[in-house]
């Protein structure tokens, strides 16, 4: 079972990825983890990637696709894998297809931008412990204070509304076109494309995924 997850940051992909991995016993493949592992292992692709990164440049799609192919050939991917955060662009998706990497399911987590802004900009964190709250969905007992220590809660830079909106803009420009690409792939019978309402409660989304993936 080879799965690609699509959806904006804050759409709930991470939570559901965990559910799918545990239920189906397949690993989640993150390009960041792959790059770090290849560089540490000193593989040919790892050394190429390191040279590019040391020069302050972006790692090319060719290197990333090569790493993906190496990674999915490993024994823990025998029953499939879960790709989250890759492919991000149509050229990457096309290169993956050309490299013979088949995808069984493309799952798109659909959440309106305003809902994502509300979810992410409402997060509050206790710096000392990492405890996370939400002003609407999981408020602290005392506004702005950690339940355990009574210390101030902070907003992480990543959760600031302006940052969230910038990340959403990048997603819509780069990754949203993939929805059309994989829609055509599904019409051609090359994959199954499923759009999921990410505004539903977490357990309902998990149930829906269990039905879709079997």
Swiss-Prot record:
Keywords associated with the record: ATP-binding, Cytoplasm, Kinase, Nucleotide biosynthesis, Nucleotide-binding, Transferase
Matches recorded under SUPFAM superfamilies: P-loop containing nucleoside triphosphate hydrolases
Binding locations of ATP: 10-15, 123, 132-133, 200
Pathway: Purine metabolism; AMP biosynthesis via salvage pathway; AMP from ADP: step 1/1
GO biological process: AMP salvage
InterPro entries the UniProt entry points to: Adenyl_kin_sub, Adenylat/UMP-CMP_kin, Adenylat_kinase_CS, Adenylate_kinase_lid-dom, P-loop_NTPase
Residues covered by region (LID): 122-159
Alphabetized PROSITE patterns for the sequence: ADENYLATE_KINASE
EC supergroup of this enzyme: transferase
GO cellular component assignments: cytoplasm
Any one Gene Ontology molecular-function term assigned to this protein's record: ATP binding
CDD domains with a match to the protein in the record: ADK (cd01428)
EC number: 2.7.4.3
Residues that coordinate or bind AMP: 31, 36, 57-59, 85-88, 92, 156, 167
Record's catalysed reaction(s): AMP + ATP = 2 ADP
Domain commentary: Consists of three domains, a large central CORE domain and two small peripheral domains, NMPbind and LID, which undergo movements during catalysis. The LID domain closes over the site of phosphoryl transfer upon ATP binding. Assembling and dissambling the active center during each catalytic cycle provides an effective means to prevent ATP hydrolysis.
Family membership: Belongs to the adenylate kinase family.
Quaternary structure and interacting proteins, as annotated: Monomer.
Role according to the record: Catalyzes the reversible transfer of the terminal phosphate group between ATP and AMP. Plays an important role in cellular energy homeostasis and in adenine nucleotide metabolism.
PANTHER family reported in the protein's UniProt record: NUCLEOTIDE KINASE
UniProt xrefs under HAMAP family: Adenylate_kinase_Adk
The protein's name in its UniProt record: Adenylate kinase
Lineage, top ranks: Bacteria, Pseudomonadati, Pseudomonadota, Gammaproteobacteria, Aeromonadales
């Amino acid at each position: 079972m080879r799965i690609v997850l699509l959806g904006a940051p804050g759409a709930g992909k991470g939570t559901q990825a965990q559910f799918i991995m545990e239920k189906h016993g397949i690993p989640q493949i993150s390009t960041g983890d792959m790059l770090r592992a290849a560089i540490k292992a000193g593989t040919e692709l790892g050394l190429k990637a390191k040279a590019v990164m040391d020069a302050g440049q972006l790692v090319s799609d060719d290197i990333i696709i090569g790493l993906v192919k190496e990674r999915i050939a490993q024994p823990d991917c025998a029953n499939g894998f879960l790709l989250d955060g890759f492919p991000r662009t149509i050229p990457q998706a096309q290169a993956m297809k050309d490299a013979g990497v088949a995808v069984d399911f493309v799952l798109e987590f659909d959440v309106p931008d305003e809902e994502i802004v509300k979810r992410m900009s409402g997060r509050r964190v206790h710096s000392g412990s990492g405890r996370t709250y939400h002003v609407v969905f999981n408020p602290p007992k005392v506004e702005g204070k950690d339940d355990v220590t009574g210390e101030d809660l902070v907003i992480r830079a990543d959760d600031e509304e302006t940052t969230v909106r910038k990340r959403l803009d990048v997603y819509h420009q780069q990754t949203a076109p993939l929805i059309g690409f994989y829609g055509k792939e599904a019409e051609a019978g090359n994959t199954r494309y499923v759009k999921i309402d990410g505004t539903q409660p977490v357990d309902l989304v998990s149930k829906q995924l269990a039905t879709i993936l079997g």
